[in-house]
UniProtKB/Swiss-Prot annotation:
<keyword id="KW-0934">Plastid</keyword>
<keyword id="KW-0150">Chloroplast</keyword>
<comment type="similarity">
    <text>Belongs to the RuBisCO small chain family.</text>
</comment>
<dbReference type="GO" id="GO:0009507">
    <property type="term" value="C:chloroplast"/>
</dbReference>
<protein>
    <recommendedName>
        <fullName>Ribulose bisphosphate carboxylase small subunit</fullName>
    </recommendedName>
</protein>
<dbReference type="InterPro" id="IPR036385">
    <property type="entry name" value="RuBisCO_ssu_sf"/>
</dbReference>
<keyword id="KW-0602">Photosynthesis</keyword>
<dbReference type="GO" id="GO:0019253">
    <property type="term" value="P:reductive pentose-phosphate cycle"/>
</dbReference>
<keyword id="KW-0120">Carbon dioxide fixation</keyword>
<dbReference type="GO" id="GO:0016984">
    <property type="term" value="F:ribulose-bisphosphate carboxylase activity"/>
</dbReference>
<dbReference type="Pfam" id="PF00101">
    <property type="entry name" value="RuBisCO_small"/>
</dbReference>
<comment type="subunit">
    <text>Heterohexadecamer of 8 large and 8 small subunits.</text>
</comment>
<keyword id="KW-0113">Calvin cycle</keyword>
<dbReference type="InterPro" id="IPR000894">
    <property type="entry name" value="RuBisCO_ssu_dom"/>
</dbReference>
<dbReference type="InterPro" id="IPR024681">
    <property type="entry name" value="RuBisCO_ssu"/>
</dbReference>
<keyword id="KW-0601">Photorespiration</keyword>
<comment type="function">
    <text>RuBisCO catalyzes two reactions: the carboxylation of D-ribulose 1,5-bisphosphate, the primary event in carbon dioxide fixation, as well as the oxidative fragmentation of the pentose substrate in the photorespiration process. Both reactions occur simultaneously and in competition at the same active site. Although the small subunit is not catalytic it is essential for maximal activity.</text>
</comment>
Length: 138
């Protein structure tokens, strides 16, 4: 099951050329970029691991691409994404996020249903990948 989080998530994987164009856009708008990775793909896992330091005041997209390549090389079977942060007063938020690397096999999620009093149903998601210990999931 393909993980769909962030911008472009329903499109085919971006090529390096397409990623470079998005990074050039991020730099041209004066946004700060950072690279993050995880092996826990749960949709509510918003705390991915930060790769290096955030790239503030970067004037060249190749610096961000270098960090992406380094992360891909060190974590080839992890999800890797780029975030663009706008520090403009009143916004001060992540304005763009997209996945740039995925594991070769994405096992998907288990939907668990529980019955509660009053015929109430509660649902939860469980990633099949998290059945293995952290660092050995893919």
């Amino acid at each position: 099951m393909r993980l769909t989080q962030g911008t472009f998530s329903f499109l085919p994987d971006l090529t390096d050329e397409q990623i470079n164009k998005q990074l050039a856009y991020i730099v041209s708008k004066g946004l700060s970029a950072n690279v993050e990775y995880t092996d826990d793909p749960h949709p509510r896992n918003s705390y991915w691991e930060l790769w290096g330091l955030p790239l503030f005041d970067v004037k060249d997209a190749s610096a961000v691409m270098y960090e992406i390549s380094s992360c891909r090389k060190a974590k080839p079977n992890y999800y890797v994404k780029v975030n663009a942060f706008d520090n403009t007063r009143g916004i001060e938020s992540c304005v763009m996020s997209f996945i740039v690397n995925r594991p070769a096999n994405e096992p998907g999620f288990l939907l668990q249903r529980q019955d509660f009093e009053g015929r109430t149903m509660k649902y939860s998601l469980h990633s099949y990948a998290t059945e293995k210990p952290e660092g050995a999931r893919y």
